[in-house]
Amino acid sequence: AEDLSAVRARAEETLASLMKQRTILNVRKKKRRALYDALSDAEALAPARDCYESGMPGMEEPFARYMDAVSALEQCGIHREQLMAEKAELYRQLADVNREIRRARKEISMCDTIERNRPQMEHDIHVAEAKAKEVERDEYRRR
């Protein structure tokens, strides 16, 4: 029971630390959200630019969004490649932290399950030990 509570306490400390880490990463993501959205829009709407320039009707709105995205990226002063690498790294870190959070929560859940089932497990162990002693006595008598 003491070992179980120690494992649970460590898992809860780890979870709290991971939650703080995730909050920090989410704040960083939120600060750059406009740039990350512009990066995605510029990439996704590049074909709309070609269509607009070739005179295809109905491409005014996507082209305007494309131009807004390109303008935002040019004004930020960060190269697109650097911004893409930063975004990819941030999302990778978030995925890693989220995976660790799920693992810590699963560990806490297992501790809860073990604690809930402990009385029954202890009972089963006592029954098995008593049965083993009984078998041992019977074998001793037969000799």
For the regions a protein language model found, what residue spans apply to each?
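Extended intrinsically disordered terminal tails
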Residues: 1-143
